[in-house]
A protein has these predicted regions:
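Secondary-structure transition motif
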Residues: 1-125
Length: 125
């Protein structure tokens, strides 16, 4: 069985957060004090959990939901999303968003260049 991994963005503090899962509840740790607080069930709107896709970019870096990929062949930036039960890569065309299976973009040779929280400007280009 594969290990399901996540990373956690704290929307309130605008930074990555440590977390642990105990009996289906997600708890978060304050990096400054080391104290565990809250739970995902009670404060879900303050946090975004992003799942690991089990895919890696051309440099061997793991790809997570919310990552921004650059694919040099088409010279496009893609946002990694989870929709309809699968990981997808999407980019904004002239008039609409275009969606592809993530594996198809990874095969083309993409690189993780940021994420939607720390580098939103990459998706505006």
């Amino acid at each position: 069985m594969r290990e399901i991994k996540f990373r956690c963005w704290d929307r309130f503090k605008q930074r990555w957060s440590n977390y642990k899962i105990n009996d289906g509840t997600v708890y978060f740790m304050d990096k400054n004090t080391g104290v565990w607080y809250g739970s995902y069930n009670k404060r879900y709107k303050d946090f975004n959990l992003m799942q690991y896709t089990e895919l890696k970019d051309i440099r061997g870096k793991g790809i997570y939901e919310g990552d921004i990929l650059f694919e040099s062949f088409g010279e496009r930036y893609y946002k990694v999303v989870f929709k309809n039960g699968s990981f997808r890569a999407e980019f904004k065309g002239d008039f609409e968003w275009h969606h592809f299976d993530l594996i198809d973009v990874v095969i083309q040779g993409c690189e993780v260049v940021g994420n939607i929280y720390e580098n939103p400007e990459l998706m505006e280009e």
